[in-house]
Amino acid sequence: MLRGCFLLLRWSILVAHRANGSPNPVNEHNKMVTKSAFLSLSKSDRFKTFLTRFQSFNNVTRRFVAGEDLADAVEAIRVLNQKGISASFDHLGESITSEAATREEVNEYLRVLDSIEENKLDSNVSVKLTQLGLDVSQELCYSNTRRIVESAAAYSNFVRIDMEESPKTDATLEIFKRLRNEFENVGIVIQAYLYRSVKDIEELLKIGARIRLCKGAYNEPAAVAFPEKADVDANYSKLTKLLLTSGIYHGLATHDENMIAAAEQFARELAIASDKFEFQMLYGIRRDLQEKLVREGYRMRVYVPYGRYWYPYFMRRLAERPANIWFVLRNMMRG
């Protein structure tokens, strides 16, 4: 196991080091192999134990995760707000199978909403339904999520429901639509790498849904998702145009400068004002680009994760961008 981990790390150094070079089929294939490997490792307790032996690794995770406590996330968001950047709290945790544990997650999100109000933060919240009981029962999950959305409504705040692996998509959309029938302060995430997403967006726009569009970060089979990055990018651009012409306020979640430039150009061509949508990015990734977009007059929201269960989230971030792997490895070697 550990020998395989070391070989993967050596491979990742090579792929990450070349990540900023000119794209070609070989490089893109290598990136896809690396992504698949890191997504598999995101579920490995043994690999987590191996990595967390290194203090330098634990230190570098703070680049991408605000900390383990709510106070850490509050401070991180306060700093972002001072730069003109909005935020979205995410208490890390997923695949919870205990009803009691799902209640604890609800209580944590109620604390988050109280804290946003008390600290006058420019932030909403993001939730994963597997945190809130989706793997226990759909009705429990709906009830738990409704409590959070109702509490947010009392503060005139907003709740974004994250999308997880494709087997969860139908149930996630069903719960969202039930909530949207009662509340306006709830939105959903759609993943551009899924073939079904164009039809899902068309249906969601009919009910006025506010959508965060992302590319997708899970390891999906070719039967349900585009396997090639070029196809994902093309679909992301297509869906971006669909959202921007809907007249509804949406979020475009990407760190890809080509996707951002295409969205900017499309908005200019159709005279869509910069305050009619927002760009969204992840905490600690492309901070230079986040601040640049704000200076140019665009709205920017950063997804700020915190909590003890940071490992799967962190590994997915490494899987998404080889440059992140290089950053982590370089800092570990310095430590």
Descriptions of predicted regions:
Residues 19-22, 155:
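Compositionally biased non-globular segments, especially hydrophobic aliphatic-rich helices
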Residues 27-335:
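Positively charged, amphipathic and often flexible ligand-engagement surfaces
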Residues 15-19, 26-28:
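Acidic, Ala/Val/Gly-enriched low-complexity intrinsically disordered segments
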